[in-house]
UniProtKB/Swiss-Prot annotation:
Function: PsaA and PsaB bind P700, the primary electron donor of photosystem I (PSI), as well as the electron acceptors A0, A1 and FX. PSI is a plastocyanin-ferredoxin oxidoreductase, converting photonic excitation into a charge separation, which transfers an electron from the donor P700 chlorophyll pair to the spectroscopically characterized acceptors A0, A1, FX, FA and FB in turn. Oxidized P700 is reduced on the lumenal side of the thylakoid membrane by plastocyanin.
Oligomeric and partner information: The PsaA/B heterodimer binds the P700 chlorophyll special pair and subsequent electron acceptors. PSI consists of a core antenna complex that captures photons, and an electron transfer chain that converts photonic excitation into a charge separation. The eukaryotic PSI reaction center is composed of at least 11 subunits.
Protein name: Photosystem I P700 chlorophyll a apoprotein A2
Keywords (A to Z) from UniProt: 4Fe-4S, Chlorophyll, Chloroplast, Chromophore, Electron transport, Iron, Iron-sulfur, Magnesium, Membrane, Metal-binding, Oxidoreductase, Photosynthesis, Photosystem I, Plastid, Thylakoid, Transmembrane, Transmembrane helix, Transport
Binding, phylloquinone: 671
HAMAP family in the record: PSI_PsaB
Root EC class: oxidoreductase
Higher taxonomy: Eukaryota, Viridiplantae, Streptophyta, Embryophyta, Tracheophyta
InterPro entries, A to Z: PSI_PsaA/B, PSI_PsaA/B_CS, PSI_PsaA/B_sf, PSI_PsaB
Species of provenance: Oryza nivara
PANTHER family registered for this protein in UniProt: OUTER MEMBRANE PROTEIN, OMPA-RELATED, PHOTOSYSTEM I P700 CHLOROPHYLL A APOPROTEIN A1-RELATED
Annotated residues for binding of [4Fe-4S] cluster: 559, 568
């Protein structure tokens, strides 16, 4: 028989309908379900695909460097980072008329270009790159790494180089190598780069391979390190009037604890950053020697887990059985990795704007907005994925005998209590927050704004005060100049930090009021409800009171026929599917809040946010409508401007989003009938009937149509907001 797609599933390959194609694509990466798969081959395939992933990442970053070097304006941007607009790449579009060519010719370019809102210019400048040649060199190096990764992936699929199953299951060795090798050594190497290349560059000294060994990064070299006088490395830091990239006001320190921001660049001190990375390297290099391998020293993770029995005996057998459960389940490991990565990505979003580490990026408002929004959305998708694979673990890999009465089993035993508590918290947050917003709306509508219910976030203000913010007059801990906490840190690091916290031009500890109180609770509602849906999906994945045998149906199933009182929409997949909508809406509130708060801060009219954010009409009118006006007017009978492309994307995003509903709110039979009518017409139309297809066309399954709908909803939603965000910010601030 001829080989048909998909080769990994003979059952699907013989399917006579178009289901073969769609199910083939859907299960292409579900290696576990493929014909003739063994546990060893599964691990080897995944391992090899990691190299492919790395190759793609290196190729992509290489492309960024290459296009900026070729078509960008890096060298002229460096001369004046605050006023020259950084160019991402040129645009060649045969549809452009003269007005379009003029509108998109910016940043000193000769023709139409795209502006970079990714922050790469600021990053490359901060780490010591200065010329187009530097960028080309970086691009070539990354291209080399990409090729190396591809070769590595291919090599590890060859019989001689395939790692064995025992190698993959050796958790202690992997942890040691990842902690020491991946995090420790790379952090140490990055500290080295900052000290040897980036910090000298920030002081006007150009260090490259040709003079790398001649230029001492510190006047006394390794002397202070070897004699134990480490504090010398912190002496004579850059002064507050230091001009970044020049010798003016430059010091000689390489590892400092200044705190706060460089006055000119509004970013963290490079010497503080180097110090931070050195500390991280130190911690991880030690951490990478903790676990017992073939040397017989260090901890055995299994022993650690088995020894952890909760006190009092009332919480079961603690972590017994967890080692084998985690080590033998790829889905459990992936779930843990995704949960960690999701949290880290969200933390990156929060820290990139509040503690900016790249020179001048804090004054590039559109880039700040784009990076915050980008990282929050990425975090949302990664976190929902963590719960998806947690649910798949419970269905495919969980063994009740191995986990008797341990924490996993007890989570399942207590799932009703967990789910109902989450439900109660979500209901409480939702009704109270909405109640306050709607009450305030009504008061404004009736012309009595003074009757709004406005709650000051006193606990959050108290926390900000404890960290040194004096605005609220709490006089506590670091905001109390006479207290022991304040005096203890004074010589060490406090002056820079306290100045930064109380300087109202940055995003560190923004002043908060009733509008912030309300939107924080709206976001808390979104987070708790998303979590409720995801946790319920995972805890009910194996079975529920309604459907005790759910695990036998797999991760995703539409229904189990008409019986049992209705078993549709209760697969773990359905929970994930619903949670993604909540995740997107929650991040919508998060990004609306962040963006509006910052727009008013940057424009110097914070009172607009403070006054309008306490009722829903304020959000709709003074944030969404007011800031989309330029977009809605992007191209009109009087010509076009550089926002036109965003106006088009705004419309296009709405279109994609709305298309999602066609798949989400429909029934399979309708499509099947429509498809058969279209196929009938096709077969009876001259010329068209010369083209035949081998597979009988059938409608998508219910689950597939939901996936397609969800994809359109998500992509359209994000496209629409991206266009709104970039256009409304760049339209105001350039």
């Amino acid at each position: 028989m001829e080989l048909r797609f998909p080769r990994f599933s003979q059952g699907l390959a013989q399917d006579p309908t178009t289901r073969r194609i769609w199910f083939g694509i859907a299960t292409a990466h579900d290696f576990e379900s493929h014909d003739d798969i063994t546990e060893e081959r599964l691990y080897q395939n995944i391992f090899a695909s990691h190299f492919g992933q790395l190759a793609i990442i290196f190729l992509w970053t290489s492309g960024n460097l290459f296009h900026v070097a070729w078509q960008g304006n890096f060298e002229s941007w460096i001369q004046d980072p605050l006023h020259v607009r950084p160019i991402a790449h040129a645009i060649w579009d045969p549809h452009f008329g003269q007005p379009a060519v003029e509108a998109f010719t910016r940043g000193g370019a000769a023709g139409p270009v795209n502006i970079a809102y990714s922050g790469v210019y600021q990053w490359w400048y901060t780490i010591g790159l200065r010329t187009n040649e530097d960028l080309y060199t970086g691009a070539l190096f990354l291209l080399f790494l990409s090729t190396l990764s591809l070769i590595g992936g291919w090599l590890h699929l060859q019989p001689k180089w395939k790692p064995s199953l025992s190698w993959f299951k050796n958790a202690e060795s992997r942890l040691n190598h990842h902690l020491s090798g991946l995090f420790g050594v790379s952090s140490l190497a990055w500290t080295g780069h900052l000290v040897h290349v980036a910090i000298p560059a920030s002081r006007g000294e150009y260090v490259r391979w040709n003079n790398f060994l001649d230029v001492l990064p510190y006047p006394q070299g390794l002397g202070p390190l070897l004699t134990g006088q480490w504090n010398l490395y912190a002496q004579n830091p850059d002064s507050s009037n230091h001009l970044f990239g020049t010798t003016q006001g430059a010091g000689t320190a390489i590892l400092t604890l200044l705190g706060g921001f460089h006055p000119q660049t509004q970013s963290l001190w490079l010497t503080d950053i180097a110090h931070h990375h050195l500390a991280i390297a130190f911690i991880f290099l030690i951490a990478g020697h903790m676990y017992r391998t073939n040397f017989g020293i260090g901890h055995s993770i299994k022993d650690l887990l088995e020894a952890h029995t909760p006190p009092g005996g009332r919480l079961g057998r603690g972590h017994k059985g967890l080692y084998n459960t985690i080590n033998n389940s790829i889905h459990f490991q992936l779930g843990l990795a995704l949960a960690s990565l999701g949290v880290i990505t969200s933390l990156v979003a929060q820290h990139m704007y509040s503690l900016p580490s790249y020179a001048f990026i804090a004054q590039d408002f559109t880039t700040q907005a784009a990076l915050y929004t980008h990282h929050q959305y990425i975090a949302g998708f990664i976190m929902t994925g963590a719960f998806a694979h947690g649910a798949i673990f419970f269905i495919r890999d969980y063994n009740p005998e191995q986990n008797e009465d341990n924490v996993l089993a007890r989570m399942l035993d207590h799932k009703e209590a967990i789910i109902s508590h989450l439900s109660w918290a979500s209901l409480f947050l939702g009704f109270h927050t909405l109640g306050l917003y709607v009450h305030n709306d009504v008061m404004l509508a009736f012309g009595t704004p003074e009757k709004q219910i406005l709650i000051e976030p006193i606990f959050a203000q108290w926390i900000q005060s404890a960290h040194g913010k004096t605005t609220y007059g709490f006089d506590i801990l670091l905001s109390s100049t006479s207290g022991p906490a304040f005096n203890a840190g004074r010589t060490l690091w406090l002056p820079g930090w306290l100045n930064a916290v109380n300087e109202n031009s940055n995003s560190l500890f923004l002043t908060i009021g009733p509008g912030d109180f309300l939107v924080h609770h709206a976001i808390a509602l979104g987070l708790h409800t998303t979590t409720l849906i995801l946790v319920k999906g995972a805890l009910d994945a194996r079975g529920s009171k309604l459907m005790p045998d759910k695990k036998d149906f797999g991760y995703s199933f539409p229904c189990d026929g008409p019986g049992r009182g209705g078993t549709c929409d209760i697969s773990a997949w359905d929970a994930f599917y619903l949670a993604v909508f909540w995740m997107l809406n929650t991040i919508g509130w998060v990004t609306f809040y962040w963006h509006w708060k910052h727009i008013t801060l940057w424009q110097g009219n914070v009172s607009q946010f403070n006054e309008s954010s306490t009722y829903l009409m304020g959000w709709l009118r003074d944030y969404l409508w007011l800031n989309s006006s330029q977009l809605i007017n992007g191209y009109n009978p009087f010509g076009m401007n550089s926002l036109s492309v965003w106006a088009w994307m705004f419309l296009f995003g709405h279109l994609v989003w709305a298309t999602g509903f066609m798949f989400l709110i429909s029934w399979r039979g309708y499509w099947q009938e429509l498809i058969e009518t279209l196929a009938w017409a096709h077969e009876r139309t001259p010329l068209a009937n010369l083209i035949r297809w081998r597979d009988k066309p059938v409608a998508l399954s219910i689950v597939q149509a939901r996936l397609v709908g969800l994809a359109h909803f998500s992509v359209g939603y994000i496209f629409t907001y991206a266009a709104f965000l970039i256009a409304s910010t760049s339209g105001k601030f350039g």
